[in-house]
A protein has these predicted regions:
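Active-site loop/oxyanion-hole signature of alpha/beta-hydrolase fold enzymes
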Residues: 36-40, 49-89, 250
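Flexible "cap/lid" loop of the alpha/beta hydrolase fold
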Residues: 99-103, 110-139
Length: 259
């Protein structure tokens, strides 16, 4: 699997297909395999690239890192692959990274897609949800907590469970320390005053059953980006791409002019 060096960390990525570049960024504790279904469709039209974020999947896992590190990693991936401009899609944590990239280098993002997003947070959304339900989660480890709160996060638990299990089998599991570092990287960010600098046409998709990043957070993000459209899926939670996959790909392909 190809790798590149980003500020001292070795990160793993995959490429599929040819054409204009299209980069997909996964969520917290996820990996590049989370986008297997999307890649199988997008590679017919695009040079499709999926990255294991720093601290995730097969990429190197430093003991500490930040959201700025994630953003820099994507910019260095563009440099490594000699990409001047790309379509950029991020889900949850990936959408925060995508916002940061589009703010830092607006000329390098052709179109921006933000899924299950927010534009600010004192903690990771998962840690905030755990705190909200602290009494019922007492004594549980991270994985057990995720299972317990899943009904607050997703609408189609069966589809999400199958998807996350399959993706999880294809990459190393994160240790408790690695999960903690991944959560800490998302503490205390706020892009709201900078979103006006995003020049790319933007599509924001939220699920109306998402208790992690509620639709209003996506709606706020869309309001603050000059050329953004907000869409709310009514049978999805935090994973619209998994819970309503056909509708999701219809919106994405139409947005990038492939329908």
């Amino acid at each position: 699997m190809p790798t590149f060096n980003s500020n001292g960390a070795t990160l793993t990525y995959e490429e599929h297909g040819t054409g204009e570049p299209f980069i997909l960024l996964h969520g917290l504790t996820g990996n590049r395999h989370m986008f297997e279904h999307e890649v199988n469709i997008l590679k017919k039209y695009f040079r499709t690239i999926v990255l294991d974020a720093r601290g995730h999947g097969d990429s190197e896992k430093p003991s500490t890192y930040t959201l700025d590190d994630h953003i820099g990693d994507v910019l260095r991936l563009l440099d490594h692959l000699e990409i001047d401009e790309t379509y950029l899609l991020g889900v949850s944590m990936g959408s925060y990274i995508a916002q940061g990239v589009a703010i830092a280098s607006p000329e390098r993002v052709k179109k921006l897609m933000l899924v299950a997003t927010k534009s600010q947070g004192k903690t990771s959304s998962m840690e905030a949800l755990f705190a909200k339900h602290a009494d019922e989660l007492e004594g549980l480890d991270f994985s057990e907590k995720v299972v317990k709160v899943s009904p607050y996060i997703f609408h189609d638990l069966k589809a999400v469970g199958k998807w996350s299990h399959k993706a999880g089998q294809q990459s190393p599991s994160l240790t408790a320390k690695e999960i903690s570092a991944a959560n800490e990287a998302l503490e205390g960010f706020d892009f709201r005053e900078d979103l006006h600098g995003i020049t790319a046409e933007t599509l924001v998709i939220s699920g109306d059953h998402d208790g992690l990043n509620q639709p209003e957070a996506g709606r706020e993000t869309a309001r603050l980006i000059p050329n953004a459209t907000f869409v709310e899926f009514n049978q999805s939670g935090h994973a619209p791409n998994v819970e309503q996959p056909l509708l999701f790909l219809d919106f994405i392909l139409e947005f990038v002019d492939q329908k």
